[in-house]
Amino acid sequence: GNSVLFRAFYATSFSNIMKTSFGAYTNAVYAFANMLNKALKMVEPDYCCVAFDKGKATFRHQMTPDYKAGRKETPVELVEQFGLVRDMLNAYNIKYLEYDEIEADDIIGILANKFEGDISIFSSDHDLFQLIDDTKHIKICCMKKGMSDIGVLDEHALYAEYSLKPY
């Protein structure tokens, strides 16, 4: 959720940021919805779940106090859109998960390793590349070029594109 929403915001904020007639920012929600629809059509999943960071300190902050210390504050124009995206997911009847002390990528990792079958993870977060596993049928669908292009990475494609192995 977070990585796609951030990408949606920055991919659409270079020009006029979209707002409703009453002033609510919607550019990231609009782009997120478009990407979600594209992903759902591409994969046609039996189940779908979106993972969010809660924005609070996690166990990693306890281990390394300066974890993510250099990050800029999230723009207020984007902060306001997180609730709208959650509302949209509820309207789509798509489950979303967020937990104190656990980041979204950890939630994704837990779910990917818990379930069997073809698992497609939509994210631009390269940290998730480590989850790619051809034997477990786990692949990453990465957003490229803003929000318009989706590349699918399995073990072969990961090595061909980045000279990396997931484990």
Where are these regions (language model features)?
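Non-catalytic, usually N-terminal nucleic-acid engagement modules in DNA/RNA processing proteins
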Residues: G1-C49, D53, F59-R60
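Extended two-metal-dependent nuclease catalytic cores across DNA- and RNA-processing enzymes
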Residues: F14-K19, A69-Y167
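Glycine-rich loop at the start of a catalytic domain that most often binds anionic cofactors/ligands
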Residues: H61-D66
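Short catalytic/ligand-binding loop motif for oxyanion handling, primarily in non-cytosolic enzymes
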Residues: A57-R60, F129-L131
